[in-house]
Amino acid sequence: MIIRSLELKNIRSYESGRVEFDDGVTLFEGDIGSGKTTLLLAVEFALFGLGDQRGDSLLRATSNSGSVKLTFTVDGEEYTVYRELKRGSSGVQQGELYIRKQGVVKKLSAKELKAEVLEILGYREPLNPRARSRIYRYAVFTPQEQMKSIIEAPKNDRLERLRKAFDLEKYSRAADNANLVSRRIRRESESLEDRSYDLEDKKRELEGLLGEKEKLESEKKQLDSDIEGIEAEIAKLKSEMEVLQREKNRIESAEREIESLQNEIETLRSSSERLMERNRSIEEEYRRSLDELQKCSDIREKLQEELNSLGERISALELKRESLMDDSRRFREASIQYRNLVSELENLIKTGRDLEDEISGLEDYTDRIKSKIESMESIEDPGYTEDEVEAGIRKLEVEVSDLQQELGGIHGKIEDYESIGRRGVCPTCDQEVNPDYINDKLSSARERKGSVESRIADLRNEIMNKNELMKRIAEYKRSREELRLLREDLEKRIKECHRRRESLDNIRERIRQIEEGKAESEKLIEELKDAESDFNKVEHELKSLREMESGYSSKLAAASGRMDQLRTRITELNPETSREYRDNLKKIDENESNIAEKRAKIRENEEALKNRDEVESSIHDLTQSICEMENLRDEKRDRRAAVEGKIEEKQRQIGNLESEIAKKRELRKRARELGNYVTWLNEYFIPAMDDIETHVMAQINHEFNERFQKWFRVLVDDPGKSVRIDEDFTPIVEQDGYEQNLEYLSGGERTSIALAYRLALNMVVQRLTDVRSDILILDEPTDGFSKEQLYKLRDIFDELESRQIILVSHEEELENLADHIYRVEKSDGTSIIEKTG
């Protein structure tokens, strides 16, 4: 990770600030308490959130909101993280949070943003937003106070904190979790044992149920045998019953056949009677048809005579009608023509009156237009164009504006002269001024003022006159356009009036022609009015005779048709020639023959009815025997069903018991398996975790000691003095083979030990977490250093090979080691950052 920029707003002592970071060594220098460490805390807050600290420890006391924006790169990819703090009724909480990557802004919650940052940095840590980043705190940035507290803390506290830094707590957590799991498994195993305590009792209960079931199955087997014998006897009796039943069916069939034959005989008798009645009806209808045929013949002859008489009268009237038809046609044509001429005449008279009214209206309208044209032609041309007048107005307005400016200057001079006259001293040179000179100046200025004001008034009057002229020009242009439109309208109206007069003349000529035709039609109608009346009378009489002729013809046709029907029917009804009559006689003979045959069959069936009582008695006895055997069989079946129910109940009980026994066996088996797990956890896994932690801690101690000694030798050039750490990571200083208390060391030596301890811790944590960090942050690492020790820091930086190192110090001598220098100062409680190198 490489930091590129940091922006703060209302964070601790900062109202606002921005820092640009580059590769190399960046130094933040300033007095103690100026706000240098706040920058480092802001970086940590931007990356990981508040952690276990309170929001009001970061938010400026006088502000209700603040924010930090951090831009950094990882593997060449740039990211920007933004976190906001807001003060509310419940305290200071995080507000808007987002991350920008690949140009896309994504708003997240505190937990989601921390997870995103940890994934980008490759830190494998818990996602709890209220926990600090262990890797960052020990591999990148360790505050000065925290490092001193680690070194000076009691050994148990120091070991506990270093175990967290080295992530060795996972072994003790694993052992503690194993203990919890072991206790839970033991409780589960004991619970399973309790649930399977009565397994042997259940087995004995199962054996008893199996014995009872065996006895019931033996009883069922005997009942099956008894039922089988009874059903065989029932089958034998039913076979005998079937023989008797067939005989009974034969008797019942004979009874039904006798009844059927008797019904058929009765039907045949009824049929013969109907046939004889039908023949008598045919003979009667034959006689009636002969009488009706004679009557129809008489009526037909009378109708034919009447029809012949009507035909002669119709022929005479048709001759008369032909002679009157031509006169009647001419009369109708003359009447139609007369009505059409009258209608057209009325329409033409009305149209003529309308045209006369329209012509009168057009003449009045054209007179009014001519009068208006004469009035508008009297309007005189002003003699100027609008552009000319507008140019004149603009010129006058410019002159007025210039004069007003001059008038303003004159007013100022008059006020100055009056002021000098009152004071008697020139405000520019502070010399006395002659009053006469000032009075002359005042008179001259006032005279010029009056002249200018008079000229302005004249110019304004002239502008007003030109505006009036503009109105007259506009009025003249409007009148010219309106005059053009009126002349065009007048021309159209005159042409329209001329067309209407021509139409009126045409209508008057047509009226004269219609009146002549009307007189001719009236004369012809008068001559032919009697011919039409005579023709209508003949037409009416002819129509009446034809209707009578049609009626007689219909009656004659009906009489002829009825006679044809009667002749056909007489032929059909003649007993000598009628097929139906002869067929009826034949069917009567056949019915008598069939009746004799059916009576013979009745006598045959009556022989079969003699043994009916004997068959019915045998059937009754067999039915009683079968019923008794079936009752016995049903009793046996009921007993067998009861036994089967008991067997099923026993089988259900056995199944439930076997299932319960199987479950209890599984519970006991599972309890023993869980007991084995408890033994493995307590006797093998938990001790192994302790051994692994001890072994890993020893390896870390060895590596830490080597790095601690290496960095101390670089910082302290004293061959007689050496350092090491014991098994509790306590730093031990030896001088010429004797241990030396840390309290007796110089300030520079104690700082060297703390810095060497910090660098060793950073490098070990980086290796253990497999995090390759390109950045190192050191907070006040040189307190008490000599100049020689300060210069040795450059060797340490070169050996660390970090792309970016951030130093916070109040030592100005570190400027020689820094590539980029920022000065932090505090004024009136507000910190300010300024780049100085």
UniProtKB/Swiss-Prot annotation:
The lineage's top-level taxon is Archaea
**Any GO MF annotation of the entry:** ATP hydrolysis activity
Entry keyword Hydrolase: yes
Q: Which residues bind ATP?
A: R12, Q144
* One of the Pfam families matching this protein, by short name: AAA_23
Q: Which InterPro entries does the annotation name? A: P-loop_NTPase, Rad50/SbcC_AAA, Rad50_ATPase_archaeal, Zn_hook_RAD50
Instruction: Specify which residues bind Zn(2+) according to the UniProt entry for this protein.
Output: C426, C429
Coiled-coil blocks: 197-419, 462-551, 634-673
Zinc-hook domain ranges (all copies)? 379-478
Entry keywords, A to Z: ATP-binding, Coiled coil, DNA damage, DNA repair, Hydrolase, Metal-binding, Nucleotide-binding, Zinc
Can the keyword Nuclease be found in this entry's annotation?
no
User: What does the Swiss-Prot or TrEMBL cofactor note state?
Assistant: Binds 1 zinc ion per homodimer.
GO biological process terms, semicolon-separated:
double-strand break repair
Q: Which cofactor does it need?
A: Zn(2+)
How does the entry describe the domains? The two conserved Cys that bind zinc constitute the zinc-hook, which separates the large intramolecular coiled coil regions. The 2 Cys residues coordinate one molecule of zinc with the help of the 2 Cys residues of the zinc-hook of another Rad50 molecule, thereby forming a V-shaped homodimer.
Protein role: Part of the Rad50/Mre11 complex, which is involved in the early steps of DNA double-strand break (DSB) repair. The complex may facilitate opening of the processed DNA ends to aid in the recruitment of HerA and NurA. Rad50 controls the balance between DNA end bridging and DNA resection via ATP-dependent structural rearrangements of the Rad50/Mre11 complex.
Share what the entry says about its subunit structure, partners included: Homodimer. Forms a heterotetramer composed of two Mre11 subunits and two Rad50 subunits.
Q: Belongs to which family? A: Belongs to the SMC family. RAD50 subfamily.
PANTHER family the record matches: ABC TRANSPORTER ABCH.3
Its recorded name reads: DNA double-strand break repair Rad50 ATPase
Q: Which organism is it from?
A: Methanothermobacter thermautotrophicus (strain ATCC 29096 / DSM 1053 / JCM 10044 / NBRC 100330 / Delta H)
